[in-house]
Amino acid sequence: MTAEGLEKKIEVISINDSVPQETGPVVPHERQVVDAIIAIWKEDPTTESLGIPKLHAIVKNKYPNWSVSEKRVKTLLKKFGLTPNTNTEQFTYASDITSEDTPHIQLPAKIQIVMTSKRGKGLYAKHKIAKGELIWEETPLFFIPPLANINLVKTGKACSHCGKLLQTTTGSSMLKGLDCNVCPEVWCSQQCKKLDSAIHGLLKHNVYNPNKRLTSSKIIDSESFLELQEYCLKESWNALYAIALIYANILLDKTGVKEKQFRAMARVSQDIRYKALNSSAGAFDTLSGGALFVQEQQETLWREGFEKFIRVFPTSTSKLTYKEFLFMMGTYNINNLDSCIFLTQSHLNHNCDPNTNVDTSPVRTEGLKVYAARDIRAGEELTTTYVNPAHTVQQRQRELRVNWGFICGCQKCKEDVKIQHRRKSSTVPAASKSEIRDMLKAAENHVGEEGIELTPPEVSGERRKSVRFDEKVIAVQE
């Protein structure tokens, strides 16, 4: 490559912190304050036990131009139920989640689906399962490629189906028959090309034949899909992108089974989920389209996304109501794993100390494998973890309540709370000045004015090892 060609490929951009930031005082929104504190807790879990003054000092140090008082920090944490022993009732939506019997599901030999009043629909062991045993493996019911790679896909630099970055040249792809003969997109393998063959043309090719846009029986408007795809990329809205692909696959399934299976999953409206966000000021994953705005702005975003969504499916406008759109988005958000939807895996309920390990393949189209993390008894429920078990119990509870609508009461959560209480109770409170004076006076009365003379140790020449105190030590100087 010549120097001139290289120069054309290089773009000089300005880094955010190279531009001087505003130094004037800024009054942050209450959600900004609470989200900042939650971020501090995530970065350093030990800060969760700090008092309000120290926590306020960290916030001020991190955001020096914020005009936020210690009193306001305390008020906001109390308002959103983020202070210890708070009496504030926190919003949950587990009771709003519904599910139905899953039709046409082929389960592994050792497990069965059981519906209970407390846990809802779950997977239970029919027979004893040994630790380390492969219980089942499955490929996605709905595969969702990475939204972030869309521009690379459009230029043939990533696989049109799985989104995998391509190292081969376009020429070699053409020789292998992996290039599309209509658009610039290519596939990484014959397998991906085969999996993508039915839907690729419907989503992306009609735009190249304007006459087809006049066909009344067309179930997918590719031009509208490409517009929606760009919109999702701009807004970082993975859930909207995902449900568009899911509904396209549902329309292509002439048996109607995929639609029934998706509707049978744990189902909740996205606007209900958003209430949990507002009640805690904690953030959803930004890709889910749920954490960027206050309620009024969020409603506007949903409406705009809905209008773009229904334009993609011109023959389904009577069926696709705004209410159903929100249900589809909420259902996707609480059931997806690594952005994809798995039929059997979606039945696994949560436990912070799960008895299964779910291993997703680095090759995303290959799906996942579920192993027994320990011996599982016959009749025992199979569980997975929705959050990182290594996080503090408070952080796990926040994430579970906002993203899945419930407050976990598993044994690990109970034990973690007990451990925290024991640690707090074992800490000796700092002595007050009056207590120190009383201690000194009592010591003087006991030993007299001359004090105690300490003789040097008989063995010298070796430095004593330092003593590490686990309790607080009071040093007194005259």
From Swiss-Prot:
GO cellular component, one term: nucleus
Major place of residence: nucleus
GO biological processes: methylation; negative regulation of gene expression, epigenetic
EC number(s) recorded for this UniProt protein: 2.1.1.-
Pfam family, one: SET
Coiled coil: none
Functional description taken from the UniProt entry: Histone methyltransferase that monomethylates 'Lys-5', 'Lys-8' and 'Lys-12' of histone H4 (H4K5me1, H4K8me1 and H4K12me1, respectively), thereby controlling gene expression and remodeling chromatin structures.
Molecular function per GO: histone H4K20 methyltransferase activity
InterPro entries registered for this protein in UniProt: SET_dom, SET_dom_sf
Keywords: Chromosome, Cytoplasm, Methyltransferase, Nucleus, S-adenosyl-L-methionine, Transferase
Superkingdom of this protein's organism: Eukaryota
The keyword Methyltransferase appears for this protein: yes
Reaction catalyzed: L-lysyl-[histone] + S-adenosyl-L-methionine = N(6)-methyl-L-lysyl-[histone] + S-adenosyl-L-homocysteine + H(+)
This protein's name: Histone-lysine N-methyltransferase SET5
